[in-house]
Amino acid sequence: MSRRTEKVASLLQQELGAILEKEYPRGGPLLTVVEVKITADLGLARAFVSIIGNEEERAETMEFLNDETKNIRRILSSKIRHQFRRIPELEFREDLLYEKASRIEELLRSVRKESGENE
């Protein structure tokens, strides 16, 4: 990524996080914008979100984000339009790193427990 796309991605991550926190306060799962990846032409921004909750809550949250993408983009546009000629299209994707890390931690605990029992 070029320096410009990195700066744009960082700005979008901050602004999207603020929008989701202020404009869409929701009870339920914790939602965090973990990373934003943007295409070289600045036309598409993929926002990776971490959702801490059960499977149903995560699915509902992703459905909500996908349904509200146009409204979120409109709010984003009003906040950063003075910095960009064109606001990138938004795409939300779930970041499963937290779940993968939890699963690895769980596996490590079970291995430690088994090795402790076998000694």
From Swiss-Prot:
Main location: cytoplasm
Keyword Cytoplasm in annotation: yes
Localization, UniProt: Cytoplasm
GO molecular function: ribosomal small subunit binding
GO BP terms in the entry: maturation of SSU-rRNA
GO cellular component annotations of the record: cytosol
Keyword terms of this UniProt record: Cytoplasm, Ribosome biogenesis
InterPro entries linked to this entry: KH_dom-like_a/b, RbfA, RbfA_dom_sf
Assembly and binders: Monomer. Binds 30S ribosomal subunits, but not 50S ribosomal subunits or 70S ribosomes.
Reported function: One of several proteins that assist in the late maturation steps of the functional core of the 30S ribosomal subunit. Associates with free 30S ribosomal subunits (but not with 30S subunits that are part of 70S ribosomes or polysomes). Required for efficient processing of 16S rRNA. May interact with the 5'-terminal helix region of 16S rRNA.
Protein family membership: Belongs to the RbfA family.
Name of the protein in question: Ribosome-binding factor A
Organism the protein comes from: Chlorobium phaeovibrioides (strain DSM 265 / 1930) (Prosthecochloris vibrioformis (strain DSM 265))
Underlying gene: rbfA
